[in-house]
Each structure stands twice: as C-alpha cells, then as structure tokens.
C-alpha cells in the first residue's frame, strides 16, 4: 500500500474510533420507573381511585377570583408574617433576568421612569450573557452561568458577544420611553439574548444539560405586551409581557389599540387548547395548517354557534394587527370555554403530556416542571405564578412547611394528607410535582423530571414528564417543601 494512503487510512480509523467512543446516547430510563408499577400508567387506574371524578371542584368564576386574590396579595406585603422557610429564595426567583412577582404598572410611570426601567432590564440581559448576572444554579451547583456556548458546545468569543450586545442597542434607549401596545400572533419565545440563527443558543456546559438558557419562557398566542425598545436591526423588540421582560421577534407580534387587543386577549367566547399542541387551518377542509396553539392557550370564537371557527391575531405587512378567521378540525382537542375543573379532567390532561421531554428554559417550545403544571391548570382558568416557590402563596390555604429533620415517615404523612390531583408540592430550588396518590404508603407524583439515577453501574436519564416516587429528584426529601392546594 502507498505509505501516503496508509497514513490517511490510519488517521481516518483513529478519528472514527474517537468519534465512535463518544457517540453513545444517554440511557433512557424505562417506561415504568422504580417505585411505580405498570398499571399506574393509565388514567383508568387513577380514575378508579377517585371518590367523585366528575365533581366540579371550583367554578370558573371562583378560579378567576383566586387569580385576582393572588395578584392583590402580591401587590401588598406578600410575605408578611410568613414562615421564613416558606418565603421564596430570591436567588431562585431571579435566576433569569426579566422576572417579576407583580406585573409593573407602566401606566403609573412617567416616560423617564420607563426609560430607566428599560435600561436596567436590558443591562441585566447584557450582564447575564457575559456571565456577570448569576453566580450559580440551584440544583446544578457545579454549573455556573459564567460563560456560554453555541449549539456545537463551542464557547462564544468576545467578538460574538460584542455582536449580540450591539444588537441589543442599549445606547439607543432614549431618556424617555413611551410604551407601544402590541399582541403576540403566535406562541412566542421570550429571549434574554436577541440571537440571529438557530445554532446561536446559550448552552451553559458541554454535557447532558444542553438547554438553551438564553430563553425565559414562551409567551402565549394572543398575549398583550408593551413594546419598550427595538434591537438595532429591528428584528427583535424588547417587551414587558405576562412572562416577564425580554426580547421577542418582531414578526411574532402586531401593533394595535388596547381595545383591538383586548378582543383577542380577553374574549367573551373562546376555545381553550386541551391538547399538547393543536393546529388551526386556513379553511374548513383543514388540509393546510395555518399555525398552532399549545395547552392552555385560548382563541376567540368567531361565532358561538360554530365551535370550529376561531379568530386569530394576524400581523399585516405594515406591522398592524388584524383579526383573521381560522378553522379547527372536527376532532380538535379543545374545550369551548374553560374546561370544567374535575379530578377526571386533571388526570386526563396530565396523561396527554406523558413522555414529553424536559425543556428547562422552554426554548424548544417545551415545558419544565413548573410550566407543565401551569399549562395543565391554565385549561381551567388558573394563572399560576412563574416560579413554583410562589405556588404556596397562590392558594394560601396550606401554609405547612415540611422539613428534612422531621424524618421520612412524617414527610410522607404530610404529603399523603393532601388531596390527590389537586395538590402541587414544591421542594428546594423551585422544583414542583403534581401529587396524584400513593403506592404501598409512598407518595406517587407526576413530574417533568430533569434528573436520572444509577443502577448496576449504568446511568439512566429520565428527563421527561412521567410518574415517579419521592426518590426523584434525589434532593427532594433533603430540602424543605411546601404545598399548593387548588381547591
């Protein structure tokens, strides 16, 4: 053999061998996880355990009143006289920039004050991107938000970060800012960094945790937002949304009057998406999808007599808002009006998401532990807060704090004292799960689990919405936890 060809062959073998050695996927945890049994993975198993599966627990008006009550309490002194171990950890609440406990009232602020707020919030985004915002991540203590990499897990250079910062255009924010009214025309990602192309994500490590942490959340279709600033290219706008401050692609919203927006965001007659993701179509044949909406999203009905015909917010070429008609399939997974709040409906919705992957930052339009239960209960009208550590203050009817030093028996007793299907519990760092029952005296929950376990020398990753016992996450019984009873 030609020595040159031999050398090339050896190089190829070495390169391929090195690749193959690192090409294994992470082991998927089995469908039936430790601590559970196969029968549990059906809705029938849990419905059979319910005393009154079709009893309406709360009316829609009572649920909306709970939302109003929570917002009112948060505007006052929300944590006054609360157990110190029940009060949320500020580091968890502010893990990402742009969050707030109470929606800022821009109407009560002067243009100069709005400008100061915008400069501060955009500054937080810049600091976050440059690793100056957060020192560490609760639950991932070995990982710090100090530097980021792209989709190939290659660290960003200074000039790349400079380009992103230039796009944020902080230098163009004037001394006074007048908010513009707009509405999202699709489910829109709320970004910390206004990136240009799909590979420009914010990975925090080259490992299993390949989440894009340059994302805050997904803002629902038809959500009113206040536009406060635009990026240098005009490709993004900086907004105040129901999910926080952040950057939304300009093409994903439309400008309109408050009255026009209200008709779409607060409709009197509407359908709620009760499927994981439901398309809408351009005509009655439902051949070509025109878009989609997600669990808990609402769309106005064009006519009460036709539950298939909905109005969707549409961005015209000039950026202004228009309302267009769209069709739902005959078997579309939706509810006309709020879904009745029954135990059967809770577990049915929960099982529709079974197996969905864990998306910590919602950058893939997925869900994490908090947003899974938020979207689930949104179908009934609940507007749960952005962070699970605030859930206990939403219902405010269970102020119990369970501590590790009480021991496993007391911890189990405290969990099992709550009503299944209607109770969310939250443990250290804001991790939450939906309590659904017990197996041999041990609590069983549904959880979008970002963790895994070792067995016989093999690592199994869960990282999906599924059933589990209290062994996941492994720190659950080692931290304080609280409850949110939605009844």
Residue positions per predicted region:
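Bacterial N-terminal signal peptides
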Residues: 9-17
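Boundary regions of SH3-family modules and the immediately adjacent low-complexity/disordered segments
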Residues: 24-191, 197-202, 207-210, 240-275, ...
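Low-complexity, Gly/Ser/Thr/Pro-rich intrinsically disordered linker/tail segments
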Residues: 35, 41-45, 49, 62-69, ...
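Conserved beta-strand/loop element in small beta-rich adapter and peptidoglycan-binding domains
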Residues: 207-231, 286-305
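Second-shell loop/turn segments in exported
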Residues: 212, 332-337, 355-364
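...with weaker cross-activation on analogous glycine-rich loops/strands in unrelated enzymes
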Residues: 218, 385-456
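Glycine-rich catalytic cores of cysteine/serine-nucleophile enzymes that process amide/ester linkages
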Residues: 277-326, 356-367, 428-474
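Active-site nucleophilic cysteine motif
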Residues: 346, 360-391, 429
